[in-house]
Amino acid sequence: MLEYKSFFFLLAVQLISISASSQETYKGPSQCGDMEVWDYSTGMCSPRAMSEMPMSMVMLHGNAFFVQTYEERPRGRDAFSIPNMLMFDVGKSVKNHYFNVDVMATVEKWTYPKDGYPELLQIGEKNEDDEPYIDAQHPHSSPIMGLTLSDTISLGDDRDYLKIFFAPRGQSTDGPVAFMHRVTGMVNPDAPLGHHIGQDVGHITSTVLGVSWAVGRATIEASAFNGTEPHPTAVDLPLGPLNSYAGRFIYRTSDRSYLMGSAAYVKEPEPDEPTLDHIWRYSASFYNEHVINEGWRFYNTFIYGLVNFYDNTGALNSFSEEFLFTSNWHNIWGRIEYLQRTSSELDILSATPFEPHWVTALTVGYTYNLLKWKDGKFGLGASLTKDFLPTDFRDSYGGDPLSGKIFLQLEGMKMWNFSSARSEMPKMNEHSH
């Protein structure tokens, strides 16, 4: 009964948010200036080349949490971790081309405990001892999560463009906007539990060659890439054959909301599982923002993900609803997750290994901005997560476990414009990240 209640509660929250997005006060990609376009892969405004206004841009964005976690036993543990990311972006326009180098970096390999960042029900990847991360989030590839070289070609006077990109490591064109780039995800130190079920898993991919074509309200993206996932604890940047493919379609339903859908064929995703030839990943997502009044904004993200042939299972599904109420000093946020797990993934020996079971995780959090300055902020936050488990999992977890986190957050963004038309160049959208 709880499973159905969780699903309908999640659906109700989404319907409320959709109705809110129809109001005129809502803002989104329309916040970009005349010399900017909306980059859906990073959820932010990006410079657009104009032949009569040559420009050079540098952008630096960082986000770090200093987190103390407390979890109920027997599966829980207490630990200190520092989830973090640093994005460095440099670009230059030449006529109607904008050439760009984007670097995504982290040092999580050195700021996470050996067993990973504590997060009950989280799965995915293996540590340096070749042991799977269970009830823990793996560190992201350190120090380089992504290195992308791109050429964005402006098509006419409108914001239509063609983007061609190559990444030794970067984002393939499947999945939603990655959690670390979503406004609703950037306030939460936890990665979504659906991270490896069609949601964010494509945001760190090896050897990506892709194209993005934006025309009017629609954007069509395609990429070829190497399907084998980079090892999260290896300090490397390997290249591989282009043996996997993905496509994504994005439609801007209004100036302040958009839909995204994707599909991907992924060849040999797990090198440790030679019998797994390929998997299919699918996702659908919706993003919007609503201005409540002059002081408060509401952001919302809804995500559905599906993976076929994962962990010897025909299909695994995940639903996620993220929200953020934010003002100048206060941030109220949360995540509602409803997804399938197998006992094999969670190392539960008392249940059928590969049978999917629905689990629910409800998270609510609050962050107070202690300090704010022009290019950054420093906040104090806390969150509580309550997990609701099926009967087959409850004995292993001692019931429906509760976990809590207390953290400090340091976030900042700085942009430098070296354009000769500097006075006419709009600033980067402050709500992009």
Model-assigned labels for residue ranges:
Residues 60, 64-68, 101-107, 164-168, ...:
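Transmembrane beta-barrel strands of outer-membrane/channel proteins
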Residues 86-92, 147-153, 209-215, 222, ...:
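Residues on the lipid-exposed face of transmembrane beta-strands in outer-membrane beta-barrel proteins
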Residues 95-100, 157-162, 217-221, 255-261, ...:
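Repeated loop/turn-to-beta-strand initiation elements of outer-membrane beta-barrel proteins
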